[in-house]
């Protein structure tokens, strides 16, 4: 959120989101539900993707609220309202205003915004903002998710000229992508499964991952590296997202554009590719003899049609289940890649006999080295980086690396922090926009005191060990006990 105080005392709030994703969609609908009626600026493909994601997630919210109320009424509980409705989604979509990449436009007087290619998923952009306040000018960049370079289909992240302040993501701020031949591994999995007579089942995110997989399958088939067995995309949302991807060639990279032109304005053209629409068509897939590839949502295998395909294939020793995306803690996908032997799906207890693969080379996120390289390519170093949008350990490591490599200030915001910026000068304080309970304020102050004490103890320990290295092992053991004790007493919060 950017709050701009005008010279006449007026206040303008600007909400910034860089791409279409479930949490971003929920933000849009929540704002609209609470009365927001201003413009929502986005790229063409983002608007098209939102047109399927917003109503779909609203429909899920309504269904969950209806289910909760059916149970709750019997127990005498209060009526639950959905967080947002299909009507809220429709109202949000009417507020969308399209802007092209590279097009500078005024959101309010004195504030100019430009979308640049972020290279994460179709339509994703990082935001360059210029704010003019009298004789002071401030340039900001809001990165959102920056994409991993050399992904199929979409362009690499555009090079930014620089800014006074950068609000950066840190999703992979402490990780480096493993470099390996993922096309070769994918081909080996398919060939081995076909040789056994089984099916390849791939839980995949509807937006981005499904389209990348189709691109790879087409390439592997054209090179004769995999057989032309039936390929099914069994997800209504993935079907529509794929259609949107196929009709936005202006966002393709050079290789994809050449392929699109060569194939008669079709990015993916495989005679063995089928898109299923109805539930009946989906269920019929498992009755078709012979090996096949099935791509279905959800990507973490917690809901959707993929459950039906897992139910029919997990017990088969000849089938393979291939995960090509992050699997969150507690999801079916996570339990399968961790080696669970039996799992309940759709009310049925199933033995896991299929081969389980966890391919790690498909992330659309730039890793730590790629983020550092992207920032190093800028002509100017910012006055400060505000490191956000990541787990604390990832944010801390990226902030440390940015400071050491670029020699600039870094700050990891806490909940309720406000960065007040005037031109190129900045200071942090607690925001008046966030209502915080007094007990929470006291707790925050106490924890900051703990952080101060920790730094003093750390400095003391480092000095002791520097004078007497033999004590390092003993100190490490004491710290490990302290760490375990803290984990134990805080784990049930």
Residue positions per predicted region:
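C-terminal regulatory/interaction regions
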Residues: 219-222, 269-493
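Start-of-domain signal
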Residues: 1-32
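Short, surface-exposed connector motifs at secondary-structure boundaries
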Residues: 9-11, 35-36, 192-201, 227, ...
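Short, charged, surface-exposed secondary-structure boundary motifs
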Residues: 50-52, 151-152, 176-178, 241-243, ...
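Acidic/glycine-enriched edge-of-secondary-structure segments
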Residues: 137-143, 149, 169-177, 203-204, ...
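Gly/Ser/Thr-rich loops at beta-strand to alpha-helix junctions
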Residues: 6, 121-122, 205-212, 299-303, ...
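Long, charge-dense
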Residues: 233-252, 415-428
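His/Asp/Glu-rich metal-coordinating catalytic cores
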Residues: 35-212, 216-234, 251-258
């Amino acid at each position: 959120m950017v709050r701009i105080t005008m010279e006449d005392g007026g206040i303008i709030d600007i909400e910034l989101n860089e791409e279409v994703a479930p949490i971003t969609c929920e933000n849009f609908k929540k704002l609209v539900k609470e009365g927001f009626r201003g413009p929502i600026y986005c790229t063409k493909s983002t608007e098209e993707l939102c047109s399927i994601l917003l109503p779909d997630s609203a429909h899920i919210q309504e269904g969950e609220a209806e289910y909760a109320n059916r149970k709750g009424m019997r127990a005498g509980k209060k009526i639950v309202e959905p967080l947002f409705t299909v009507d809220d989604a429709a109202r949000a979509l009417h507020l969308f205003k399209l802007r092209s990449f590279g097009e500078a436009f005024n959101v309010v007087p004195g504030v100019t915004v430009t979308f640049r290619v972020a290279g994460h998923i179709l339509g994703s952009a990082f935001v360059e903002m210029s704010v003019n306040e009298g004789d002071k000018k401030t340039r900001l960049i809001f990165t959102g998710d920056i994409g991993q370079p050399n992904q199929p289909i979409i362009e690499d992240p555009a090079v930014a000229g620089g800014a006074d302040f950068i609000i950066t993501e840190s999703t992979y701020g402490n990780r480096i992508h493993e470099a390996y031949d993922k096309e070769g591994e994918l081909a080996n999995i398919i060939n081995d499964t076909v040789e056994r007579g089984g099916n390849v089942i791939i839980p995949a995110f509807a937006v981005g991952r499904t389209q990348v997989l189709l691109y790879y399958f087409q390439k592997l088939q054209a090179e004769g590296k995999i057989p032309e067995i039936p390929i099914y995309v069994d997800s209504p949302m993935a079907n529509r997202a794929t259609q949107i991807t196929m009709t936005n060639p202006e966002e393709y990279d050079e290789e994809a554009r050449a392929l699109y032109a060569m194939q008669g304005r079709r990015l993916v053209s495989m005679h063995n590719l089928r898109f299923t629409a109805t539930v009946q068509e989906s269920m019929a897939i498992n009755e078709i003899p012979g090996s096949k590839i099935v791509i279905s949502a959800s990507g973490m295998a917690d809901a959707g049609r993929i459950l039906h395909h897992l139910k029919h294939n997990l017990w088969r020793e000849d089938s393979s289940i291939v995960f090509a995306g992050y699997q969150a803690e507690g999801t079916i996908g996570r339990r399968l890649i961790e080696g669970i032997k039996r799992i309940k799906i759709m009310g049925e207890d199933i033995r896991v006999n299929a081969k389980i693969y966890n391919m790690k080379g498909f992330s659309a996120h730039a890793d730590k080295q790629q983020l550092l390289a992207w920032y190093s390519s800028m002509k100017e170093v910012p006055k400060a980086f505000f490191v956000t949008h990541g787990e604390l350990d990832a944010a801390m490591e990226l902030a440390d690396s940015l400071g050491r490599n670029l020699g600039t200030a870094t700050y990891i915001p806490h909940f309720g922090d406000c960065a007040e910026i005037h031109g190129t000068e900045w200071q942090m304080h607690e925001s008046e926009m966030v209502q915080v309970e007094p007990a929470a304020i006291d707790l925050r102050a106490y924890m900051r005191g703990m952080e101060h004490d920790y730094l003093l103890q750390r400095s003391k320990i480092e000095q002791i060990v520097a004078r007497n290295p033999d004590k390092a092992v003993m100190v490490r053991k004491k710290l490990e006990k302290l760490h375990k004790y803290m984990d134990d007493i805080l784990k049930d919060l």
